[in-house]
Amino acid sequence: MEVIAGKMVFGGDCIAENSEKKIFIPYTIPGEKVEIEIEKDFKDYSVAKNLNIIEKSRYRTVPFCPYYGKCGGCNLQHIEPEFQRQLRVQTLKDAFFREGIEVPQIQIVSGTDKGYRARFQLHDGGLMGKRSNEIIPIDQCPCATEEVNKYLKEIPFTERPKGRIHIFGSKNIASIPDGFDKIVVAEQSEKKQIPIKNNGKKQKKAKARYEGTFSESRSACTVKILDKSITFDALGFFQSNLEVLEKSIPLITGGISGKNVLDMYSGAGTFSVFLADSFENIVLVEHNKSAVVYAEQNLAEKKHKSFGVSGDVWVKYHAETCIKECGNF
């Protein structure tokens, strides 16, 4: 079956243009003519396999990673980096357009194309295959930081922990003394609960909105970001590209100040740590209650209020009361 690759969507797939049904095609570039084979067929869409590029885009390039197309990590290495960024901008614009929101010109914040990724998940010692349960053994990754690659090189595939483990490796890690490998390897296991700290003091009883949360000291990681210390759980989410994070923070938090600021989907409070310098009060909303524990630690000396609920729940049940207590944002 021959189709023309249309617009790119989140995840890197293109949607076939000349098809009655929506078909997602990996490893293509908008405008390319490709031969495909349907791998999975669903009611509203299909997922295809890219068999052959009949008419190549001028933006197509040779991927620099030997595992590209095998592991499920990267999706755009077949596209020249500058055009990748243009496609990402268009994908973001499309997302706003679908919600009826017009956006001004989008500023691109980018970093190096290699050696930037600090956060990895390994499954039985390897990476998951593209859209499969196959385990891909790797001993290096061009996108990984030096610290992560040192681990992959020194610990053979067969000697790595089984199950799913989370790795965070970066020169920015401050919780590991200099002279030691700057990497946190966290295995998923039964969590041991430790007390929540608020304003530097232990709470005898967690507040209701923190109930059911935990903090695992063995997987805790502290990084230095623009001279501020931020602690998070390596088992959870944290930005994997610290270079871009450090470039983004001044653009997001700089030049604004006031009484109250709302940090929706705050995670461990990364941006709130910087917003606290120019706002009197921070309100954090994060559905991952375990991340809220670290946000409390990171904002311990600052006036703030945290909610361990989803964004829609906060808007529906907490926003009105919060505004009455704190004032408008």
Question: What residues fall within each predicted segment?
Answer:
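Terminal RNA-binding accessory module
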Residues: 1-63, 67
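Conserved "cap/hinge" positions at secondary-structure junctions
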Residues: 38-40, 124, 169
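Extended interfacial segments that mediate partner engagement and assembly in macromolecular machines
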Residues: 51-63, 69-162
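Short, acidic/hydrophobic/Gly-rich beta-strand patch recurrent on exposed beta strands
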Residues: 14-19, 126-131, 295
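Rossmann-like S-adenosyl-L-methionine
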Residues: 4-14, 172-329
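A short glycine-rich, hydrophobically flanked beta-strand micro-motif that places a catalytic Asp/Glu
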Residues: 104-106, 162-171, 183, 263
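Short, conserved phosphate/pyrophosphate- and ester-handling motifs at nucleotide-, phospho-/glycolipid
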Residues: 31, 144, 241
